[in-house]
Design a protein with these regions (language model features):
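Bacterial Sec-dependent N-terminal signal peptides
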Residues: 1-26
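Surface-exposed loop and adjacent secondary-structure segments within mature catalytic domains
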Residues: 122, 128-172, 194-244
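Short, solvent-exposed loop/linker segments at the N-terminal edge
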Residues: 37-41
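Loop/turn elements at helix/coil->beta-strand transitions in domains of secreted/extracellular proteins
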Residues: 110-111, 145-146, 194-199, 255-259, ...
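Structural beta-strand segments of beta-rich domains
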Residues: 43-47
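Single conserved hydrophobic/aromatic residue that forms the stacking wall/gate
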Residues: 347-358
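Alpha-helical scaffolding within the catalytic cores
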Residues: 239-251, 277-285, 317-329
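Extended acidic/polar, glycine-enriched regions
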Residues: 48, 54-123, 127-130, 195
């Protein structure tokens, strides 16, 4: 009898403890806000997350010892902005709603989003039989704590997500070899020229269509873009309209940054007649959702390639110059944008072991 009472009391105590703990939700932050991150310098940078509903959340930044506060809504969501200084660090940011959470080793500098398809996704170590020129030496000498890397895991979804899978890493031979070559070389140059920390967030998927990085609303002007109505309509994880916006871009929207670099267009080579309008809509859409004005949006002209290699037998080979023409139109339509001309490069060539990126 006595043991039964003790057992019952223990179970009741455990239940009450669990109930008490469940009423106080731990502060949770998106993966992009984590140890080792880079925040954009000299601005009001967004931070957000979840906590106990209706609970006050305070954020303290070590660079100025200021405290900022927000109140979580009924769903536990909160958001605020913090003033960032000139480039520097490392710093800490402390979150508190009764229980503290601290982010360490934070740098302030230039933060860039890098997106597109395979020429953006391709790592420094290269693809099979497609090495990156000079990559071995560049990887060997890549250690630089001022350059931070974040790769968004490939994610294709029917509905918009609130977080991504990924983590911040300092530039070292081990991290750089698996990181986007295009993004790394861009970031390395920015770091060398400006002598400030650089953060690079890569959200890219080889073979992805422009339509996959857009919302259904933006695509209304393009009836040939078939918007999935159910999960079953997603026939291609990287080409179906909206799916990469939902899974890889939507969670990042609002991340205060310097700008975007974009390398995509190859998948749209046979739909060049719509690309200028579609790409313009993508840029305007991203800027509207970010609410950060006309941030820089730089993109790469598609490189030379014999598209006859991938054209179905019996079908007309469409000249890729039409897509380049469409790309060229965009920088004249869109403020604060620019195109890197690659027509004379040897990125896509027929010899199987020649470098793909130069």
């Amino acid at each position: 009898m006595k043991s039964s009472i003790i057992k019952t009391g223990t179970m009741l105590a455990g239940f009450l403890l669990a109930a008490c703990l469940s009423t106080h939700a731990e502060i949770k932050l998106p993966a992009i806000f984590s140890d080792g991150m880079v925040m954009q310098q000299q601005t009001n940078a967004n931070l957000w997350g979840t906590a106990t509903p209706h609970k006050k959340v305070t954020v303290t930044t070590s660079w100025n010892r200021k405290q900022y506060a927000a109140t979580a809504d009924k769903n536990g969501a909160w958001k605020l902005t913090v003033a960032t200084p000139e480039a520097g660090g490392p710093y800490t940011v402390t979150f508190d709603d009764g229980t503290q959470k601290k982010l360490n080793n934070i740098l302030i500098g230039e933060l860039w989003l890098c997106s597109g398809q395979s020429n953006m996704e391709m790592p420094m170590k290269g693809f099979k039989n497609q090495p990156v020129e000079n990559a071995n030496m560049d990887i060997l000498h890549s250690k630089n704590p001022q350059i931070r890397l974040f790769t968004v895991k490939r994610t294709s979804t029917f509905t918009p997500q609130n977080d991504v899978v990924g983590s911040w890493k300092e530039a070292t031979p081990a991290s750089v070899r698996d990181f986007s070559a295009t993004a790394y070389y861009f970031g390395r140059l920015v770091n060398e020229i400006l002598d400030v920390p650089v953060g690079l967030v890569v959200a890219a998927w080889g073979g992805s269509a422009c339509e996959a990085w857009m919302t259904a609303d933006w695509l209304k002007a393009f009836p040939e873009a078939k918007i999935p109505q159910t999960e079953a309509d997603i026939k291609s994880k990287n080409r179906t309209p909206t799916v990469l916006y939902n899974g890889m871009l939507h969670p990042l929207i609002g991340m205060t940054m310097k700008g975007v670099i974009w390398y995509q267009g190859e998948d749209n080579w046979n739909r060049a007649h719509t690309y200028a309008d579609m790409f313009t809509r993508l840029i305007n859409g991203w800027r509207a959702e970010w609410k950060q004005g006309d941030f820089p949006f730089y993109y790469c002209q598609i490189a030379p390639y014999d598209y006859g290699i991938i054209t179905e037998k019996g079908k007309e080979v469409i000249n890729s110059a039409y897509l380049r023409e469409a790309q060229a139109k965009v920088e004249h339509r869109v403020a604060n944008s620019g195109m890197a001309v690659l027509l004379l490069s040897l990125i896509h060539i027929s010899e199987p072991t020649r470098p793909r990126l130069i």
